[in-house]
Amino acid sequence: HHKDSVKEWLTKNEIGKYIMIQFSGGQPQMGFNANNQYTNINPNRNYQPYLAQQVVNMLREEYKDTTIINCVLPNEPHYNDTIRCDLHWTQLHEMLKDAEGFVAIDSCLQHFSPSANKAGVVVWGSTRWTQFGYSHNKNLQFHMGNEWDEAKFNDSDPRNNMVEPKIILDEFKKIDKTKPVACATK
């Protein structure tokens, strides 16, 4: 069981309350080589690093006593005023259970959210939350708010994931921690 190793990592890093973030992904952890340049088979899923840093800054300002944990592989972007988490993905799942919430793209944190019983904000790029998302999360995309409109979706539009950082922060603040999580979207 990973609960003890997660607690040890949090204690070692002097972390109390925390929010988890994941703004890039698409690389398998299995067989990962840190010396490889970061590549992603679907880069339109990733949130722009410039905007991601703004989200981090806003979260730090709003939640001053809370650590921001960046859940990425070593060759993926890192953000100022966060701590990089180097734990195995199964430990990230365990860690998510006690997080204050998360902000992520369509990657492992959002997929762990139902079984970890945790809601968060998910920024969608070239994938559909109606296929891969969960209704307990705040699902956001540039062309639409938290309601899906298939007529506005084009998977090759590079603006899809360019959601304003302030909108992400506002939606994070609206997460209802008492609402049960779902198994899939509507």
Region locations from a protein language model:
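Hydrophobic beta-strand residues in large extracellular and virion-surface proteins
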Residues: 19-21, 59, 68-69, 140, ...
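Histidine-centered active-site microenvironments of extracellular/periplasmic hydrolases
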Residues: 131
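Alpha-helix C-cap/termination motif
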Residues: 12-13, 62, 98, 178
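A nucleotide-sugar donor-handling region in carbohydrate enzymes
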Residues: 1-20, 25-29, 184
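Short glycine/proline-rich turn/loop motifs
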Residues: 23-40, 151-153
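Active-site donor-binding loop signature of nucleotide-sugar glycosyltransferases
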Residues: 23, 86, 125, 142-145
